Design a protein with these regions (language model features):
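Conserved ATP/PPi-binding loop(s) of AMP-dependent carboxylate-activating enzymes
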Residues: 35-39, 43-70, 101-103
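Beta-strand->loop->alpha-helix junctions that form or flank phosphate-binding loops
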Residues: 10-17, 34-37, 124, 172
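AMP-binding/adenylate-forming catalytic core of the ANL superfamily
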Residues: 14, 53, 76-166
Length: 196
């Protein structure tokens, strides 16, 4: 909103397999959105969004169908439901499991980018023999700062705001933007390619 004053932001939702659905945000800037519309049905099973569409593709070439016997597609998006509105929490493949406690990277990313001197951030899980996974944050800075100061500042800012297991165990300062060639935010194994 700061970069484009006067612009109304609205979420949209679509998948290659079913197309783009009509969407309505609860209010400007809200993360809660109502999706579906004519030709689309949605349901939530175990906090996962399932979609059925008249416009759905037939399937993948030489691969099993992504649809169940009734034509429903598991999107693998984890959502919360509030009346007719849903809020996307993340993908089930992004869940980080720290000693049995689960978190979505987006929660930690949103806190990190709200901090001073943090231009951008990504968060991922990294395998750990003791905890299963640990939280790893990669940040881009606005201005140069020592790694020691950044780590101390981030941990201090997050302490008390989130549970201890959500605080990044490793913090990496990246020299380049964290987007791939398709301008999507890099995650998981993509992050191994980011120069630090």
């Amino acid at each position: 909103k700061k970069a484009f004053p006067g612009i109304v932001l609205q979420q949209t939702y679509g998948l290659t397999e079913v197309g783009i659905m009509s969407s309505k945000s609860r209010e400007d800037g809200s993360l809660w959105v109502k999706i579906g519309g004519q030709g689309f049905d949605t349901k939530i099973v175990n906090n996962r969004l399932w979609v059925k569409a008249q416009s759905a593709m037939i399937g993948y070439l030489n691969s099993p169908s992504p649809f169940d016997d009734e034509g429903w597609l598991n999107t693998h998006d984890i959502v919360e439901l509030d009346g007719e509105f849903i809020r996307f929490l993340g993908r089930d493949s992004e869940i980080i499991n720290v000693g049995g406690e689960k978190l979505f990277p987006a929660e930690v990313v949103n806190l990190l980018i709200s901090l001073d001197n943090i231009k951008d951030a990504t968060v991922r899980g990294e395998q750990n023999n003791l905890m299963g996974q640990i939280v790893v944050a990669t940040v881009n800075l606005i201005e140069s700062e020592t790694a020691r100061d950044v780590k101390r500042r981030i941990r201090s800012a997050l302490k008390g705001k989130v549970a201890e297991y959500k605080i990044p165990h490793k913090i990496i300062i990246a020299d380049t933007d964290q987007f791939n060639e398709r301008f999507k935010r890099m995650r998981l194994t993509d992050m191994e390619k980011v120069p630090t």
